[in-house]
């Protein structure tokens, strides 16, 4: 392109002029400390992910007892995954049926809500207890943990699983088989409860519709600790008088609680709750009131909790740590009690300090807990607040909300370090080191991004596996496995030590960053954790994306053309804090229009003729430049011609005449040569040859044969008797030759004859003695070689498993002499020997692992085995010595009683047998539990008055004979007795009628009106409870509308509440809030 493009106006219009140096940065901004961030691209090679088509909401994670599999609950699916790489072992689809979905739609719920969201996922022995919302009709199943399609039982999920997937809930399964669940018990979620079911103990729940027990709670977690079951939740604070405020709570119940008697029946008698405080200290403390998640470290009795501010306030989160002893101290302290709704909340002494779930040994309330039932009904809330271990939260962060927490205890070089993993609502995990002492603070070690840039979503679940140092994260569309030890990520000693990672240290021997377990020497392993790591804020500039192509103009001399231009900026990111500027063009120009231009003419080509008129050519092309993108093409011709040699006459034409005929062939057969010729006219200088040759008569000549005459007889040798031999020769030759004179001597023919010495018999001819080749020679003394006999076979090279032996012979019987033939064949032979395999002695394999104990109690046994296969004995080898099986006793403790009481004996059947039954009271029987029969039979036991039917049949004939013995005396006795009996009956009837008339007369007297129950059957029971509030008395007898028949695992529709129309008032005119 001629000239330069003038694009200054384009640069100014697109704003692409940038300074050569980075813009001035705020020094304070460049010096502030920020925590390291591990991007999704950096953490990607360490991650393992599992996804499944159509599966979402991976919100429930748990491990099998052997910690080899991860069990995952998602919407409409259950999965079993390998812990190593999250590969799929088994997938089970668990959807709602169409009828249930239609019923859900009819209640105004959306398609998203009317699905089966897994909300309970608990492992008990080799069984998996799982519950799902099932389109607002919760259902639970008990499955085999090794095969999720094998369903052992299916029961209602009411009171065990929430109806809505939006409701928070928690559940746990104790070792004895009881299920403790905290969830909403009805469709709209207005009846929250902490409920116990299954197992051997009676079902219990918190009081229904009583805000002092539970006030719109959001359940977070539950733990089985000692004699108690603890629940953690947040709820509207009933003791807060000024506005609506949410408090976090810790509640507990005794595991041996069986409810009250006459009061608090089917209701907890040991339920107590206390407030959890997590606040930032100051003149006016800043409270983090809403508990979001907890994590329990049983080895240290520590409970880590995540607390946040209210959703309507500024976003802020904190981590507070509570000691179990502090929680127990609050429950041992005084209660906070409100006499009535207009009274203040005041402390009240605890009637049972240091309560440890003791029970009554005797009396009417045997087996009930030591708490007084009236106290259990009134005193629920503790006065003292549970304070954290430290006055300042272990970790605080503004402008973010944490949703889940997991804690790992790591052995550093000098001390144990607690590492807290916090899940944020925007899809990252923050790794925090807890304070090392009361005076030190926490450190944010790093933040792990689980999604690519510009994408985020909340984390659904968080599970840590301490034995393998692995973190499992449940997200909306997949599950992620994150290794906690990523020491090899740091390549240098400075990066390893500067990361301040308690998992990692620099091994001076191996010269690399390793974990403590991987190090070769503790003394050579360097680590530093007291300080917090900071991120280098120096950022090198990087170009952002190119802008779209836009039209622009350019000038080329006097012509104006158009182009397409695009630009990019150094802002992704922009260089900061001394970072490098972007390298490369900030603008690209393409598709500029260009007018075509002619190239210079080429030189004239040589004349087309050397004499006479010819022409010459020259050319040019429109490629200087070539027209592009709408530019103008060149104007004019691209080729010119001119004449040449128009005055140079040509000389006479010199040329060859035509070829003459072929001459005679030089040979009649066997291949000859023939020639033809031409002459040059008008001169001697014609180009080329005047003679041309070709082969001829290439066919083979006929075969010629020629025999020489016999030579004269010549004597050969003389024998002992004076006779002698004579011989003569002749030769025969044949060949395909054109000339017979070219024949050469070929085969030799010899004849021999014997001539006697006396000449009487003349000479006799033996005929042909032999034919020899032309160069051959005949000798009567030639000796051909012959083999000697074979030697014996040599010793075998091996005693077994296939060896080799050989034998030899020599060509000396006789040796070849005077040109005789040598021996034919091998002089050495080989043969396989001892082909049978060698004997192999047996060797024991390693002992197998001990098998599972055959019984969980009462004495069982386990065993281990080994086999004689390493290798096995073979081919006569010795067998292994010793035992192939070892057994040992296990679980010798006495078994608890697992059977219910025997039922009453049944009525005798036709075969004279009675039957009684019993049932196993354990939901998950393991090993020898519930061993024995469920039925028992015995022969019927008859009393002395029972007469079998056979006896009656046999005595019928005797009775017929006795009927004839009835006489007159008998008739008189019967008549007298009947008269006396009639008189007595008449007297009784008269007396009854007189009393009835007296009562009717009394009924006509008018009495004052008093309230009476519509159903007076409970009046006596109400009178027994005069000392309690009457409303409470009605509540005690107004049974909960949800009562479980645990044996049959269904809800009894015939048990409904009773309603009374009258009101009962106490002397104090007290009312209890509902």
Swiss-Prot record:
Its main location: membrane. One of its GO terms (molecular function) is heparan sulfate proteoglycan binding. Residues 35-484 form the Sema domain. PROSITE patterns: SEMA (PS51004), TSP1 (PS50092). Keywords: Developmental protein, Differentiation, Disulfide bond, Glycoprotein, Membrane, Neurogenesis, Repeat, Signal, Transmembrane, Transmembrane helix. The keyword Metal-binding does not apply. It comes from the Eukaryota. The chain crosses the membrane at residues 969-989. One of its GO terms (biological process) is positive regulation of endothelial cell chemotaxis. Residues 1-22 form the signal peptide. Binds PLXNB3. Bifunctional axonal guidance cue regulated by sulfated proteoglycans; attractive effects result from interactions with heparan sulfate proteoglycans (HSPGs), while the inhibitory effects depend on interactions with chondroitin sulfate proteoglycans (CSPGs). Ligand for receptor PLXNB3. In glioma cells, SEMA5A stimulation of PLXNB3 results in the disassembly of F-actin stress fibers, disruption of focal adhesions and cellular collapse as well as inhibition of cell migration and invasion through ARHGDIA-mediated inactivation of RAC1. This is Semaphorin-5A. The lineage of its organism: Eukaryota, Metazoa, Chordata, Craniata, Vertebrata. The gene is Sema5a.
């Amino acid at each position: 392109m001629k000239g330069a493009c003038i694009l200054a106006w384009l640069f100014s219009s697109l704003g692409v002029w940038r300074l050569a140096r980075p813009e001035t940065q705020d020094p304070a901004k460049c010096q502030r400390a920020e925590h390291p961030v591990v991007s999704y691209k950096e953490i990607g090679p360490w991650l393992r992910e599992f996804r499944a088509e159509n599966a979402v909401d991976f919100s429930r994670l748990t491990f099998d007892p052997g910690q080899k599999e991860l069990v995952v609950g998602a919407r409409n699916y259950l999965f079993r995954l390998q812990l190593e790489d999250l590969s799929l072992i088994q997938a089970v689809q668990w959807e709602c049926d169409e009828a249930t979905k239609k019923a859900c739609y009819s209640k105004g719920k959306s398609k998203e809500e009317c699905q089966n969201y897994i909300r309970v996922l608990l492992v008990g022995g080799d069984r998996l207890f799982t519950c799902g919302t099932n389109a607002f009709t919760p259902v639970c199943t008990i499955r085999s943990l090794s095969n999720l399609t094998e369903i052992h039982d299916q029961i209602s999920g009411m009171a065990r699983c929430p109806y809505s997937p939006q409701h928070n809930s928690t559940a746990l399964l104790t070792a004895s088989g009881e299920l403790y669940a905290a969830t909403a018990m009805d469709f709209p979620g207005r009846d929250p409860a902490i409920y116990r079911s299954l197992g051997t103990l009676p079902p219990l729940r918190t009081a229904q519709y009583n805000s002092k027990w539970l006030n719109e709670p959001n359940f977070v977690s539950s733990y089985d600790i000692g004699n108690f079951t603890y629940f953690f939740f947040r709820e509207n604070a009933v003791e807060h008088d000024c506005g609506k405020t949410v408090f976090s709570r810790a509640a507990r119940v005794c595991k041996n609680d069986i409810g009250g008697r006459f009061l608090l029946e089917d209701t907890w008698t040991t339920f107590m709750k206390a407030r959890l405080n997590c606040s930032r200290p100051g003149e006016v403390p800043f409270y983090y009131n809403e508990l979001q998640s907890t994590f329990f470290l049983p080895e240290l009795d520590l409970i880590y909790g995540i607390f946040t501010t209210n959703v309507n306030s500024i976003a802020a989160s904190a981590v507070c740590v509570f000691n179990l002893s502090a929680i127990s101290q609050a429950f041992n302290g005084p209660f906070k009690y409100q006499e009535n709704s207009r009274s203040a909340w005041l402390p009240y002494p605890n009637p049972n300090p240091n309560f440890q779930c003791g029970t009554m040994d005797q009396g009417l309330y045997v087996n009930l807990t030591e708490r007084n039932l009236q106290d259990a009904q009134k005193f629920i809330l503790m006065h003292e607040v549970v304070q954290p271990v430290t006055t300042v939260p272990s970790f605080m962060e503004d402008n973010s909300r944490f949703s889940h927490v997991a804690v790992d205890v790591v052995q550093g070089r000098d001390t144990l370090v607690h590492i807290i993993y916090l899940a944020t609502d925007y899809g990252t995990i923050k790794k925090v080191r807890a304070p090392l002492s009361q005076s030190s603070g926490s450190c944010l070690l790093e933040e792990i991004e689980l999604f690519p840039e510009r994408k985020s979503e909340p984390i659904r679940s968080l599970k840590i596996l301490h034995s393998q140092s692995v973190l499992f994260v449940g997200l909306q569309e997949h599950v992620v496995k994150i290794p906690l030890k990523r020491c090899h990520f740091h390549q240098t000693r400075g990066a390893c030590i500067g990361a301040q990672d308690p998992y990692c240290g620099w091994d001076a021997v191996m010269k690399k960053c390793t974990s403590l377990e991987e190090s070769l020497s503790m003394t050579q392993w360097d680590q530093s954790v007291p300080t917090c790591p900071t991120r280098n804020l120096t950022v090198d500039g990087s170009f952002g994306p190119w802008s779209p192509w836009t039209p622009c103009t350019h000038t080329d001399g006097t012509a104006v053309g158009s182009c397409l231009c695009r630009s990019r900026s150094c802002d992704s990111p922009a260089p900061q804090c001394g970072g490098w500027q972007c390298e490369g063009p900030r603008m690209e120009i393409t598709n500029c229009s260009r007018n075509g231009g002619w190239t210079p003419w080429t030189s004239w080509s040589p004349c087309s003729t050397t004499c006479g008129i010819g022409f010459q050519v020259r050319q040019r092309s429109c490629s200087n430049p070539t027209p592009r993108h709408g530019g103008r093409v060149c104007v004019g011709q691209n080729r010119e011609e001119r004449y040449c040699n128009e005055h140079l006459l040509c000389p006479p034409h010199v040329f060859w005449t035509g070829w003459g005929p072929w001459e005679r062939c030089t040979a009649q057969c066997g291949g000859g040569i023939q020639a033809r010729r031409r002459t040059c006219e008008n001169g001697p200088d014609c180009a080329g040859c005047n003679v041309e040759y070709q082969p001829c008569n290439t066919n083979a000549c006929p075969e010629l044969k020629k025999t020489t005459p016999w030579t004269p007889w010549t004597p050969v040798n003389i024998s002992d008797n004076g006779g002698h031999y004579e011989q003569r020769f002749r030769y025969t030759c044949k060949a395909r030759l054109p000339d017979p004179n070219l024949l050469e001597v070929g085969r030799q023919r010899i004849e021999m004859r014997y001539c006697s010495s006396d000449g009487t018999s003349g000479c006799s001819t033996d005929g042909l003695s032999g034919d020899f080749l032309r160069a051959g020679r005949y000798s009567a003394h030639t000796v051909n070689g012959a083999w000697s006999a074979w030697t014996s076979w040599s010793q075998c090279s091996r005693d077994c498993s296939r060896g080799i032996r050989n034998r030899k012979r020599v060509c000396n019987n006789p040796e070849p002499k005077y040109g005789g033939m040598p021996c034919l064949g091998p002089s050495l032979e080989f043969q396989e020997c001892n082909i049978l395999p060698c004997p192999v002695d047996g060797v024991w394999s390693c002992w197998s692992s001990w098998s599972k104990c055959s019984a969980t109690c009462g004495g069982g046994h386990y065993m281990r085995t080994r086999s004689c296969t390493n290798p096995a004995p073979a081919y006569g080898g010795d067998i292994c010595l010793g035992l192939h099986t070892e057994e040992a006793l296990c679980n010798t403790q006495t078994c608890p009683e697992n059977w219910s009481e025997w039922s009453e004996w049944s009525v005798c059947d036709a075969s004279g047998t009675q039957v009684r039954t019993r049932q196993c009271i354990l939901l998950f029987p393991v090993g020898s539990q519930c061993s024995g029969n469920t039925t028992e039979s015995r022969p019927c036991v008859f009393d002395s008055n029972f007469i079998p039917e056979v006896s009656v049949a046999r005595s019928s004939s005797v009775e017929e004979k006795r009927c004839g013995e009835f006489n007159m005396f008998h008739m008189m006795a019967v008549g007298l007795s009947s008269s006396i009996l009639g008189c007595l009956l008449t007297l009784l009837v008269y007396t009854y009628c007189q009393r009835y008339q007296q009562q009717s007369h009394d009924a006509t007297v008018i009495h004052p009106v008093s309230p009476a129950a519509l159903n007076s059957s409970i009046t006596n029971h109400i009178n027994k409870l005069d000392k309690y509030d009457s409303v409470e008395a009605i509540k005690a007898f107004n049974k909960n509308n949800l009562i479980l028949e645990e044996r049959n695992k269904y809800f009894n529709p015939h048990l409904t509440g009773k309603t009374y129309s009258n009101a009962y008032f106490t002397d104090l005119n007290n009312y209890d809030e509902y």
